[in-house]
C-alpha cells in the first residue's frame, strides 16, 4: 500500500521485481541505479551469497519527482529467485504497490518462468491479493542472446496455463553489458 507522510510531504510506493533465479532482477536494479542521477537515488542495498546470488533482497530507493505537492519516492525491491527462499519472497511482497515480473527469454527457462509466475500467484493469495489487483508489468529479459523464445509464444503459453491471463503489451528488454 502506498505510504503517505503529510509531515514530510512524501509518498512512497513499493515496486517488487519478481521472477525465476538468474532472470536478471538484480541486473535491472543495477542498470536503473547506474542510469539514475545520483541526487535522485539512494544507495543500492544487496544481500548476496558468495556467488552473487540474491540471498534476501535488493533494494534501490529512488526519488522520481513531485505529484500534487508530494515528493514521490519508489522503493524498488527484488526477491530471491531460488525456490528455497520462498518465505523471503512472501515477506518482500508484503505491502507491494506494483510488480515487475522479469521473465527469462531463453528456451531453457520457459518452465522456470511459468513456475515462478505460479509461485507469485500463490504468495499473493497468502497475502490476500490477486495479481489483477496489483499494477503488473511483464518484462521479457535477455532478448539479445541466442536460443530465445518469441515473445508471442511465451505470452500465449503463460495465458494458456492461466498464470498471466490478462498480460498484454509485453516489454522486451536488453541491458547492454548486463547492466553492471
What is each PLM-predicted segment?
Residues 44-87:
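Switch I (G2) and immediately adjacent beta-strands of P-loop GTPase domains
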Residues 8, 52-55, 65-70, 90-95, ...:
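Conserved catalytic network of the ASCE P-loop NTPase/AAA+ motor domain
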Residues 79-82, 95-118, 126-131, 143-148:
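Conserved Switch II/interswitch segment of TRAFAC-class P-loop GTPases
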Amino acid at each position: 500500500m502506498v505510504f503517505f507522510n503529510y509531515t514530510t510531504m512524501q509518498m512512497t510506493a513499493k515496486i517488487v521485481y519478481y521472477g525465476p533465479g538468474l532472470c536478471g532482477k538484480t541486473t535491472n536494479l543495477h542498470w536503473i541505479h547506474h542510469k539514475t542521477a545520483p541526487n535522485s537515488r539512494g544507495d543500492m542495498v544487496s544481500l548476496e551469497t558468495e556467488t552473487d546470488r540474491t540471498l534476501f533482497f535488493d533494494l534501490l530507493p529512488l526519488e522520481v519527482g513531485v505529484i500534487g505537492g508530494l515528493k514521490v519516492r519508489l522503493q524498488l525491491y527484488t526477491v530471491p529467485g531460488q525456490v528455497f527462499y520462498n518465505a523471503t519472497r512472501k515477506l518482500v511482497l508484503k505491502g507491494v504497490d506494483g510488480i515487475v515480473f522479469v521473465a527469462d527469454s531463453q528456451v531453457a527457462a520457459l518452465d522456470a518462468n511459468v513456475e515462478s509466475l505460479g509461485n507469485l500467484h500463490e504468495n499473493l493469495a497468502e497475502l490476500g491479493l490477486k495479481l489483477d489487483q496489483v499494477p503488473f508489468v511483464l518484462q521479457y529479459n535477455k532478448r539479445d542472446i541466442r536460443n530465445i523464445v518469441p515473445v508471442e509464444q511465451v505470452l500465449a503459453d503463460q495465458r494458456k496455463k492461466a498464470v498471466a491471463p490478462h498480460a498484454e503489451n509485453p516489454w522486451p528488454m536488453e541491458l547492454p553489458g548486463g547492466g553492471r
